[in-house]
Amino acid sequence: MVHPVQVGKRTRMSFAKVKDVAEMPNLIEIQLDSYKWFLDAGLYEVFDDINPISNFTGNLVLEFVGYTLDMDNIKYSVEECKERDTTYAAPLKVAVRLQNKETGEIKEQEVFMGDFPLMTEQGTFIINGAERVIVSQLVRSPGVYYNYNVDKTGKKLFSATVIPNRGAWLEYETDSNDVIYVRIDKTRKLPISILGRAMGFGSDQELLEYFGEEERFKATIEKDNTKTKEEALLEIYKRLRPGEPPTVDSAISLIDSLFFDAKRYDLSRVGRYKFNKKLAIGLRIANQIAAEDIVDKLTGEVLVAKGEKISRANAEEIQNRGINSVDVLVEDRVIRIIGNHFVDIHKCVDFDISDLNIRELVHYPTLREILDNYSDEETIKEEIKKNMTRLIPKHIIKDDIFATISYQIGLAYNIGYVDDIDHLGNRRLRSVGELLQNQFRIGLSRMERVVKERMTIQDQEAITPQQLINIRPVAAAIKEFFGSSQLSQFMDQTNPLSELTHKRRLSALGPGGLSRERAGFEVRDVHHSHYGRMCPIETPEGPNIGLINSLATYAKVNEYGFIETPYRVVDKSEGRVTGEIRYFTADEEDQYLVAQANEPLDENGCFIDKKVTVRDKGEVLVVPSKDVDLMDVSPRQLVSVATAMIPFLENDDASRALMGSNMQRQAVPLLKPYAPIVGTGIEYKAAVDSGVLPKAKNAGEVVYVSANEVRVKRELDGGVDTYRLLKFKRSNQGTCINQRPIVAKGDWVLKGEVLADGPSTDLGEIALGKNIRMGFITWEGYNYEDAMLISEELVREDVFTSIHIEEYECEARDTKLGPEEITRDIPNVSEDALKDIDERGIIRIGAEVRSGDILVGKVTPKGETELTAEERLLRAIFGEKAREVRDTSLRVPHGEAGIIVDVKVFTRENGDDLSPGVNELVRCYIAQKRKISVGDKMAGRHGNKGVISRVLPEEDMPFLPDGRPLQICLNPLGVPSRMNIGQVLEVHLGWAASALGWHIATPVFDGATETDIEDCLEKAGYNRNGKTVLRDGRTGEEFDNEVTVGIMYILKLAHLVDDKIHARSTGPYSLVTQQPLGGKAQFGGQRFGEMEVWALEAYGAAHTLQEILTVKSDDVVGRVKTYEAIVKGENIPEPGVPESFKVLIKELQALCLDVKVLNDNNQEVKFKELAEDDDEIEVLEVNMEGTEDSTTEEAKEEKGEAYIPAEEIDEEIDYENIDLLDFTSDLDIEDDFN
């Protein structure tokens, strides 16, 4: 039943029936751990890969010995970096050793390799002052993938792809004549036997002896026109390098460099792991019938007798004894299975080698060689260490290639299985660390080329490592990655949840991933392996659906980049669920039967029911309880954080739940945050891990609290930790970040405890919206189409008021005509317009500004015209003062207004880093307090979104029997067809809880039942059906039926009407078509498109239509005349010819078509050009001819005139009577064109 739970500083009444057995991991550890790995091991691996760099003669050798990140020399703190637009980074210093083999001289030096961006504690990077997140990328894992197509006759044709991390691909395919072909690196296909010959089996006999007498292979050999190893090599060389003279030596070196050179071909640890998993002989021969006795060559022991079934244990032993080729019987045929000769080293060595920390399988022939040559433990250990790259090769080896061919042959006989590339066992994550490592590797390899060049050019005696190394390519690669990679994204900082979700996002797009256009339906679909790893709900709507996902709540990423999810282990002998929790990757989990988290258990942890519902891959089965292997740790383990914050998620339709989880990320932080009365219990964890709350670094006593800082006296050493709070800072999205202390002086705090609330948090819990008293009732049609009717109380009491801060900057640059100047002395500006400007020319803090007001006064020198003698004389007498300047001040843009909350000034004199050519930079911050208004978008947590249609006086709202009016009325029709019933349950439970004074936790898939809610309603003294008699606020009469009334948690979304409303006066025009630009940012017009024209045509509104297509759009002369007529109060003149029509004619003429416009009398119409009407326009001082450049808003604004951009007059060319001599005069045209 319902029981109290302590969440931070608040007690919630929880309806959860399942006890939490596993702690949820830190929600941003995917970022933190990956970056930590990069600094600790990833960087070292890159340097290790590139070591040593030697010149072509080999007598100069450059080695990278070690590296340090100089954490003491970080220039600015995180906050300062944001303020100064710089990157939060530490200098990377690398110890380099240069060895001259001729002289034996060794020089060591520490080389500075550029500033390396650091991750903040919140898992973000500050790049050029902007907070960015590196999104993890989901890519196909390196490995071998088999699949099949069915041909016309219904025969399965198997194919395979061998995908390395980087290097040449191998692709196998079978045609309908059973010939197996190979493509090397996407070239033309060759019979596979050619590859076998080139790898060492020259004759047909050798091939058949090794791979076994199998029909398909024989057919392939018949198709093969080469007969020896040399011929095969030459054949491959011809295919790969057509047009070059083939020789055996060059063919051998080509194949070596393609596949067996670690610098050119890299499987990575993951690739090696997947290869061994797929190709190792153990799993492939298990459960097959042995065709011959399987004998250990070393001891002569028979492991499996002929005709016996090979058990799983036997198979593993056979593999670890180093037996690599086994014949099995399939339907009376003998099929040979060849493994890739990798074994578990711990089973082959009879002493303890755990200190070598080898976790992968090792290459048996290499290991055998070491064991045969040495006998004592220490030497063997030393040799194993020395030969690590041979034992665990990062590139492909011949044994791998033979094993892949053998697997391809075996598939036709149902030995082995084909792969599903959408399975999460075959897709892995590249997180920050690995993405950075790849970038760094690119930079280093570019640098390596430079080093090699410099080694040959420079004097070898006097050379130092510093002179050899050029750090530019490395710095550029890193900078490019952080600045412009598709995976480095501007952090979504609307609220703490959006920040947290962004850091946990998984994208299949980006370099090396998929592209939107190519991604088919399968990749985007939900897969059974997503369970507990990726959220099946949270993904964007639109073209990216299914390509961008979110990590599930309990998921972790393992060392190979595969996503793991935790399960409770079931002891099958007793049928008891143990306390052990193990993490499984998707392919490990596939062998087990998994019970749900809410399966009832007794107090000993045994299943109560005899039959248990379990998952087996994608199937749901009911099995006896003794067969269950694993059990989920929590009901919320399959969804992401945002989805887990929707109460009664199990009662919502999936597509509405998707909108609900996406819209929570768009909730604007409100002035006074309130946590939801009906929560799910994950709010506290989400807020604490999101990084917006200051947490105590050490336990201790709070000794000082103010709005700006909290000081805690440490328990350990008595020192004091000071925590500065952020006050009214602007987030990336323009919302307001403000932290408020929630501890008092004298409080004792523990390590990790929350000290202050941030944006959208209440007592450390995420609080995205407000608990609102609402009813499902229609009201005079104001609920039509999901609209919402709200009470004036919400406006008056600032319930949905939010603060938005915009940043505007103005820079004074050096121009060709002289420097720009920030000053109060602006030409043609009244004193009234300067009333809030200080003597520097910058607005004062606290001033209230409206659109068009000056923020920063700035003047720019005007172009000097040729001076007359008199002017020169005056200039000589009175000095420079007479210089012409124009006003280029920074003004508040259209539709913006507010109060100046902060001004920052950066100048060269103060030693601030400014970009080249900039002398001074001023930033102004304008804050707006936005109350809720008609047109704002609001939503619940169940995907129930709507726009406010009317703000009704409080006294007119429907009211309850006790006289309280409703605050919001929602349309009851929004529920049944959308199937998001969760909102109704939330309303009922919230109604009861608010009366009882409770805050509630009802976790997803394990929340309050209908009976629970009815009991709560009864306890609160309400009707069990949750309905109430309502009266009309205007008449006081009761409504006909009872109405569902209750408390719903409602969010205000970041789609505010103030940002969207827009009206154009005279503004900029497109250069070619002379039509107004589009969009609010360009101060554009509304497009009157094709369909709108049809509508007017249908009504026969000819004059309206003509007006819209001419004077209101691109009739350049006509619009000037119309403006003039309106100003003078005259009738509007006849429209002229639209500019776009002229453009069309010019385009046709450009295609050498003789196009003329004729009138009724078949006479040619000459178009009137703007130039002819110059004099008329001048009188008006207005120019209706626009340019696309909307930045030259000048002094016209002050006079209150419309801004009209600078004039453009094209010279008209008379194409008919053009003189060809004009074109030919400068050309020598010869007569002979042959």
Curated annotation (Swiss-Prot):
Q: Which InterPro entries match?
A: DNA-dir_RNA_pol_bsu_ext_1_sf, DNA-dir_RNA_pol_bsu_external_1, DNA-dir_RNA_pol_su2, DNA-dir_RNAP_su2_dom, DNA-dir_RNAP_su2_hyb_sf, RNA_pol_bsu_bac, RNA_pol_bsu_CS, RNA_pol_bsu_protrusion
GO cellular component annotations of the record: DNA-directed RNA polymerase complex
**Keyword field:** DNA-directed RNA polymerase, Nucleotidyltransferase, Transcription, Transferase
* Record field: catalytic activity: RNA(n) + a ribonucleoside 5'-triphosphate = RNA(n+1) + diphosphate
**In the record, what terms sit under GO molecular function?**
DNA binding; DNA-directed RNA polymerase activity; ribonucleoside binding
Under Enzyme Commission nomenclature, its number is 2.7.7.6
What's a GO biological-process term for it? DNA-templated transcription
Asked if Nucleotidyltransferase is a keyword of the record, the answer is yes
Q: CDD domains this protein is in?
A: RNA_pol_B_RPB2
Superkingdom = Bacteria
Q: What is the main EC category here?
A: transferase
Q: How does it assemble?
A: The RNAP catalytic core consists of 2 alpha, 1 beta, 1 beta' and 1 omega subunit. When a sigma factor is associated with the core the holoenzyme is formed, which can initiate transcription.
**What protein family is recorded?**
Belongs to the RNA polymerase beta chain family.
What is the protein's known function?
A: DNA-dependent RNA polymerase catalyzes the transcription of DNA into RNA using the four ribonucleoside triphosphates as substrates.
Q: Which HAMAP family does the record match to this protein?
A: RNApol_bact_RpoB (MF_01321)
Give the protein's recorded name: DNA-directed RNA polymerase subunit beta
Report the source organism. Answer: Clostridium perfringens (strain SM101 / Type A)
